Amino acid sequence: MCIRDRPYVGAAAFSHKGGLHVSAVQKDPKTYEHINPEKVGNARNIVVSDQSGKSNIISRLRSIKINIEESDPKIKKLLDEVKDREFIGYSYDGADASFELLARRIIGEIPRYISINEYDVSDKKNKSWEIVSSAKAQLEVDGEKIMCEGEGNGPVNALDNAIRQNVDRLAKYSKYLKDLKLVDYKVRILNTGTEAVTRVSIESTDSKGKNWFTIGVSTNIIDASFKALIDSLDYKLFKDKAPASL
């Protein structure tokens, strides 16, 4: 696969963002594309952002096999939600899994899986003066509450471990989550000051070699990480057709 930002042939060369721009490309790709992307091993990418119009949303929905009438009011609701979220720091360009979850939640296609009622993360120094992060999380499946604990290299890793290391206790979902791994974690500070907004991006993978990307935004880095992590779990469960929680 070509490097994303490589001139002429990179994936970014075939990304389309503005609403009118996307509408024109759908009618005639030659209006904005210098070459068929498939000729250089790439594909057309319709970006969903605060500049998006209905054309962007409909194109993205079709690409993930969501069939919905163009006149359905849920399309406008999704478009407004995307713009509101972009305003506070979200960016769905490169976070396809989080966008799909958002779209399916608004349309009503995502069931409830694991509810996380509360969580707590703390740091401490051990006898070797190494910082160790610990996390506790109360999970709920089918009305049963389960307290999970874990440690890790940093608060996000600890929270991830608290959930996944106790997956055997989640009999209903253990077989779906056992092979889930976080392979990349990125943090971006969107503004300055003590109330700076943080955007966290997580890349996940499974034993089938599938990769997906999720995002979380908050003034608290742990909360932003938590949102991205939960999206990763929900996406895996949805794609593997896991049963809903009762």
Question: Predicted regions: what is each one?
Answer:
Residues 3, 153-173, 177:
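A short, contiguous, amphipathic alpha-helix enriched in charged residues
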Residues 4-147, 192-197:
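A mid-to-C-terminal "edge-of-domain" accessory segment
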Residues 49, 147-155, 213-224:
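Short alpha-helix boundary/capping segments
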Residues 64-65, 70-73, 168-182, 236-244:
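Glycine-rich phosphate/pyrophosphate-binding loops
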Residues 148-156, 162-163, 201-208, 226:
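Terminal-proximal interaction/regulatory segments of ATP-powered molecular machines
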Residues 170-206, 215:
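Generic long, charged, amphipathic alpha-helical segments
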Residues 209-246:
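Mixed-charge, glycine-accented linear interaction segment located at domain edges/termini
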